[in-house]
């Protein structure tokens, strides 16, 4: 844990060099795997979650850059990366929305419908739900029901303001 914490302290912001965050992530994963009975396990898991949030935010910001530049295939790839590598990312509903938007704007409507639907089913209290429903309606695609487990989890989790970057789009 001490080696991992050294990397955590040297981490940059999400939009800067990721090397220390990647090293911290590797050290924390190794510690969690190698020492499952450690009294520091809970602290290591919490730190890993924090490090992965920084890494996910970095990937999300890169995707946002591509989206703003209208390079939709690259944006879609980065949004997918954020969602795949960091499934617990706090901005996953926004990443899903902009992944769907990138696909739609790159003339891939059928695939975009999958991600709009995931916003509604997996993030039922997200600010993106109404936009996702509108997009699905415009495509004549079915609108799914919220997943009851996701709904219960969303109701228990306090809603955080994502700051200025989350409001840019």
Regions found by a protein language model. Give the residues of each.
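Acidic, polar-rich low-complexity tracts and alpha-helical solenoid repeat scaffolds
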Residues: 1-169
């Amino acid at each position: 844990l001490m080696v991992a914490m050294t990397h955590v302290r040297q981490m940059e912001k999400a939009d800067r060099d990721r090397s220390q965050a990647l090293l911290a992530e590797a050290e924390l994963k190794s510690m969690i795997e190698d020492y499952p009975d450690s009294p520091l396990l809970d602290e290591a898991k919490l730190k890993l979650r924090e490090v992965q949030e920084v890494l996910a935010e970095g990937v999300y910001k890169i995707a946002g850059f591509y989206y703003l530049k209208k390079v939709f295939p690259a944006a879609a790839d980065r949004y997918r990366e954020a969602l795949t590598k960091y499934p617990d990312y706090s901005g996953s509903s926004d990443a899903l929305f902009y992944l769907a938007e990138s696909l739609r704007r790159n003339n891939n409507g059928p695939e975009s419908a999958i991600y709009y639907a995931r916003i509604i089913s997996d993030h039922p209290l997200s600010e993106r739900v109404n936009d996702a429903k509108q997009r699905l309606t415009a495509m004549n695609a079915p609108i799914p029901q919220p997943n009851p487990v996701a709904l219960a989890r969303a109701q228990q989790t306090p809603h955080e303001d994502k700051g200025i970057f989350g409001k840019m789009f």
